[in-house]
């Protein structure tokens, strides 16, 4: 599998996580919606499914790792930055085959693509703290 297939899977997964956070819909319904309504050519669909379901089912564990490093109330973090942080923290914690530098870099790129102007700096800072680099 090409790395770009995983990159595309992450990109779609962060959008699905964002949608799930805002809608409160069942994660299986969100997955079905994204796989039927989005262009999925060249995407590692199995990885997309794992990222989405893993992030949803392990949300409490993931948030426990994120929250101590945020200096404002968690509910004030933008939904897209929260989606990126959750996805990256899932990879950092549960996908030991993904080097932490790859997970962080991919998260920064997602935050640049979807987040606020300096959102990528916020995401980078939090993820660096999670992996113990700061």
Curated annotation (Swiss-Prot):
<dbReference type="InterPro" id="IPR006027">
    <property type="entry name" value="NusB_RsmB_TIM44"/>
</dbReference>
<dbReference type="GO" id="GO:0031564">
    <property type="term" value="P:transcription antitermination"/>
</dbReference>
<dbReference type="InterPro" id="IPR011605">
    <property type="entry name" value="NusB_fam"/>
</dbReference>
<dbReference type="GO" id="GO:0003723">
    <property type="term" value="F:RNA binding"/>
</dbReference>
<dbReference type="GO" id="GO:0006353">
    <property type="term" value="P:DNA-templated transcription termination"/>
</dbReference>
<keyword id="KW-0889">Transcription antitermination</keyword>
<comment type="function">
    <text>Involved in transcription antitermination. Required for transcription of ribosomal RNA (rRNA) genes. Binds specifically to the boxA antiterminator sequence of the ribosomal RNA (rrn) operons.</text>
</comment>
<keyword id="KW-0804">Transcription</keyword>
<dbReference type="GO" id="GO:0005829">
    <property type="term" value="C:cytosol"/>
</dbReference>
<dbReference type="Pfam" id="PF01029">
    <property type="entry name" value="NusB"/>
</dbReference>
<keyword id="KW-0805">Transcription regulation</keyword>
<keyword id="KW-0694">RNA-binding</keyword>
<comment type="similarity">
    <text>Belongs to the NusB family.</text>
</comment>
<dbReference type="InterPro" id="IPR035926">
    <property type="entry name" value="NusB-like_sf"/>
</dbReference>
<protein>
    <recommendedName>
        <fullName>Transcription antitermination protein NusB</fullName>
    </recommendedName>
</protein>
């Amino acid at each position: 599998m090409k790395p770009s297939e995983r990159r595309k899977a992450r990109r779609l997964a962060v959008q699905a996580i964002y949608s799930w956070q805002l809608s409160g819909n069942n994660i299986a319904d969100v997955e079905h919606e994204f796989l039927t309504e989005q262009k999925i050519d060249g995407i590692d669909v199995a990885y997309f499914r794992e990222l989405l379901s893993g992030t949803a089912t392990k949300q409490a564990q993931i948030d426990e790792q994120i929250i101590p490093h945020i200096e404002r109330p968690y509910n004030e973090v933008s939904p897209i930055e929260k989606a990126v942080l959750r996805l990256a923290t899932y990879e950092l914690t549960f996908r030991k085959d993904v080097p932490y530098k790859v997970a962080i870099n991919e998260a920064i790129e997602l935050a640049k693509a979807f987040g606020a102007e300096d959102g990528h700096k916020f995401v980078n800072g939090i993820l660096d703290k999670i992996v113990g680099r700061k």
